Amino acid sequence: IERWFWNHATSAGWYGATVVITPERIDEALQGRGLNWLEVEAFQTAIGNLPKTESAEIITDACDVDANRFTQRIATGLSDWPWHNSTLVSEHKADEIYPVVAMASILAKEERDRAMVQMSESHGFNVGSGYPSDPTTKAALHRLVLQNGIDEQVRWEWATTKRFWKQNRRGDVPVRGRKSSVQQRLFHEDESRIS
């Protein structure tokens, strides 16, 4: 379907842009302003990469409980907004209402799937889909979340990563950008002696 979209985009007057957000940037957002602001910035970048056309209708899937606030935050960061006779609207579940937003969701999913394949190839083993329910992804954590650190291509702030660390590694869960604490447990609760 992705190929179909791009084959018909020009003649139909459709535009699309994807923005790749690295695990590091997601972790930094979680430590800082939060995911809502990261998503606002990503939409600003994607919209900024679109051709500036007259009478454009831009619809986003609201990533904020307040859809109007999400729209305003995006618009505020666009240096050349508003475009002539154009609208920018955010709605919850827009991918269920507007086919164009559903297509954008498919394009993003295809991009994510390619990134997971590239990660598997660069590591030399299958890391799965990257979703917490995927047994292959869970199994890959044994090779990606090591005692001496977490792989750079993994979201360190991901609840699945943190849970895996707490169940399988010692000490505090590492925080990206900070050196590991020198204070690590010297022994496990089930050991009566210091090792």
Predicted regions and their residues:
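RNase H-like, Mg2+-dependent phosphodiesterase core
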Residues: I1-S195
